[in-house]
Design a protein with these regions (language model features):
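Beta-lactam-recognizing serine transpeptidase/beta-lactamase-like catalytic domain environment
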Residues: 1-15, 20-284
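A generic structural motif
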Residues: 287-290
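Short, charged, low-complexity patches
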Residues: 155, 292-304
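Short, gly/Ser/Thr-rich active-site loops of penicillin-recognizing serine hydrolases
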Residues: 180-191, 299-316
Length: 316
């Protein structure tokens, strides 16, 4: 990745988008932390025969995560849960909410040509493609796929909002000649309204379970635990993402080596630590790298280890 990709490269964020969808579902009253959604391994829109399968679906049938709360939907990365949330929210409420995190606009303070990314709406699709918006478009956005596009800088800005418990600090890329930003006329941070402190704390906790939850059976373990959660000396909050680059017919069996490298999935991981009082937030994108937990998460841990442990920053 070249430096311009940080601010202008456009990518599907995959499951790293789920924390923001979850917060939107809380804000709009679609869910709470106790609601359970049945995940049999697939989702079906009302009146439709098409099955939208979860990543846990096993060829020949079966799979799924059982009864899923928002917290479990995070640490097991249940597509079915977030299909449900986005469908019930609807695209207008969903797109309006996530834009508050900087998605769909230039969220950088000092990079004029940074891309705005794309948070799609029915009006955008009609103008761009002269086509109607379908419910399937909405639920694809709910898992960070479809027409949705973000830059790595936007995702970094957004994850710091969660780390700051709702406080949006505009990102900046330029320092003065002395390597300082202290004298720059920066806009004041803003607080995303309507979300209680408890919901921010619960989302942070759910993201820590992505990394640290173990010893409860495979179907309850955090998706990143095996990759980075063992013997970690501080509490990290994170979320993995594996984003499709090209559409592959559902149910098709294939190996990554069957695809041209540029068509292979992108690996993402977003993280911050220490979770209780964050000192650093990290976004890792490995273009065409494969699974986020296996490929991108170890890079994120290496970066955070270097900052917190080797620089002697307090980790409590």
């Amino acid at each position: 990745m070249c430096s311009s990709d940080l601010t202008r490269g456009l990518y599907s964020p995959g499951s790293t988008f789920k924390p923001f969808v979850g917060l939107g579902a809380l804000r709009t009253g679609v869910t709470n932390w106790d609601r359970q959604v049945r995940d049999p391994g697939y989702f079906r829109l009302p009146g439709s025969r098409r099955l939208y399968r979860d990543w846990s679906w096993r060829r020949g049938g079966g799979g799924g995560h059982g009864m899923v709360t928002l917290a479990k939907g995070m640490y097991r990365s249940s597509n079915v849960f977030f299909f449900t949330m986005s469908h019930e929210m609807g695209i207008e409420r969903l797109s309006s909410f996530v834009s508050q995190f900087g998605f769909g606009r230039n969220s950088s303070f000092d990079v004029a040509d940074a891309s705005s990314g794309l948070v799609p709406t029915p009006a955008w699709k009609q103008q761009r493609y002269k086509q109607l918006w379908y419910s399937g478009d909405t639920i694809n956005i709910g898992i960070g796929q479809g027409f949705l596009l973000v830059t790595p800088l936007q995702l970094a800005t957004a994850v710091t909002v969660i780390a700051n418990r709702g406080r949006l600090v505009p990102s900046r890329m330029v320092m003065d000649a002395n390597g300082s930003t202290a004298d720059l006329d920066l806009p004041r941070p803003t607080q995303i309204p309507g979300i209680p402190r408890a919901d921010w704390e619960n989302m942070v906790w759910a993201m820590t379970q992505v990394v640290h939850r173990h010893g409860v059976g495979w179907d309850e373990e955090g998706t990143a635990y095996n990759g980075i959660g063992r013997h970690i000396p501080y509490v990290m909050a994170g979320k993995s993402g594996t984003a499709q680059v090209v559409e592959i017919k559902q149910g098709t069996t294939y190996h990554a080596s069957d695809l041209q490298e540029r068509h292979r999935k992108h690996a993402w991981f977003i993280a911050f630590a220490p979770a209780a009082a964050p000192k650093i937030a990290v976004v890792v994108l490995v273009e065409n790298g494969g699974g986020g937990s296996a490929v991108a998460a170890p890079v994120a841990r290496d970066v955070i280890d270097a900052y917190l442990l080797r620089s002697k920053v307090a980790v409590r």
